[in-house]
Amino acid sequence: MRFLAQVEATGLCWTVVAPTHKAVGVLRSYLAGAGLSPTWFPSTIHRLLRLKLKRQRDIERCEETEQTAVALEHLGLVLIDEASMVDSTLLEISLRCAHPFRTRLVFVGDPAQLPPVGEPVSPVFSLGRASRAELRQVVRHQGPVLRLASG
């Protein structure tokens, strides 16, 4: 939240998104608790990019609409939480939409989480041209489950 407070202090237009409504709800709670007010209301990444969801058998796929290309026009920064869930198509659309407007995309996620459905790995963590930072200390979870997971 400190990072977003610094972004807000600069006056940059920003928002946060996530692949699922549940994750967006958690983000909204944290932002409200921290007294942060994103320029755009937090939503799913699909909604921000104005994508249409189509179901193909058991998998949902996203398709661009006429508004997708300009979806990030007024945003300087978009924080994308739960980035391990972002599939190749969604990542490609996000990068393509951000490029013309120089919108900064900050992907936050855990490479140890399951990859998107139908993909062997999470493509976000394979971006070659991106800067990376790694958290080494677990802050939110404590107790026996953490001890078991940490070995």
Place the predicted regions along the sequence by residue.
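Conserved ATP-binding/catalytic motifs of P-loop helicase motor domains
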Residues: 1-151
